[in-house]
Design a protein with these regions (language model features):
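N-terminal intrinsically disordered, low-complexity regulatory tails that precede a folded domain
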Residues: 1-6, 153
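STAS-typified acidic loop motif
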Residues: 4-35
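Short hydrophobic/aromatic-rich motifs at helix boundaries and adjacent loops
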Residues: 7-10, 40-42, 65, 113-115
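Amphipathic alpha-helical interaction surfaces in cytosolic regulatory modules
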Residues: 27-106
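Short acidic-hydrophobic, aromatic-tinged amphipathic segments that line or gate anion-handling sites
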Residues: 106-114
């Protein structure tokens, strides 16, 4: 499996984890985002700053994954929500957050100077996600968005139905 061509870059500075998000925050990068945040949270990290300076677009899957980290899991009362901060989100991204009723979940930062930390690829090898991984994370993300606000149900009802059906279909060789 090839290594991701445009990875999310990571810098750990004090208690904060900075994630430099590439130009497009989409369903493919959502798998990587989930792996990075999950791994670092298990290591005790709770504050994540997403540098969106270079990010021009964000899709609903990426946003649903992010929202899943902000809200504690209902199945585990001891789970804690993470502090996710969005740095330099452009108007297109903030409009998406507002339209999906999740803008209140995040802290916003605006910095005129670029982030000068030394960013590196994450230490664990992350490969291009499989179709199954993308389907699973996309379904989970869209269900999360529907749970957050009932206004999202009609927006994602067909998508979640399709993803459920895709998940049941055995892969063809």
């Amino acid at each position: 499996m090839p290594i991701i061509s445009n990875p999310i870059l990571v810098a750990i500075v004090g208690e904060r984890v900075f994630l430099k998000i590439p130009e497009r925050a989409n369903c493919l990068s959502s798998v990587e985002l989930d792996q990075i945040i999950t791994t670092l949270h298990r290591r005790g990290r709770e504050v994540f700053v997403l540098d969106l300076t270079q990010c021009t677009t964000m899709d609903s899957t990426f946003l649903g994954v992010l929202a899943g980290f902000v809200l504690p899991a209902d199945s585990n009362p001891k789970s804690t929500s993470l502090d996710i901060r969005l740095r330099n989100a452009n108007r297109r991204i903030t409009a998406l957050l507002e339209s999906l009723c999740v803008d209140h979940l995040f802290t916003y930062e605006r910095e005129s100077e670029p982030c000068t930390f030394v960013f590196e690829t994450f230490s664990m090898e992350i490969s291009e996600p499989t179709k199954t991984q993308v389907n699973v994370i996309s379904l989970k993300a869209h269900l999360q968005l529907m749970e957050i606000d009932p206004l999202n149900v009609p927006k994602f009802k067909d998508v979640t139905q399709f993803l459920r059906e895709e998940s049941k279909t055995p892969p063809t060789s």
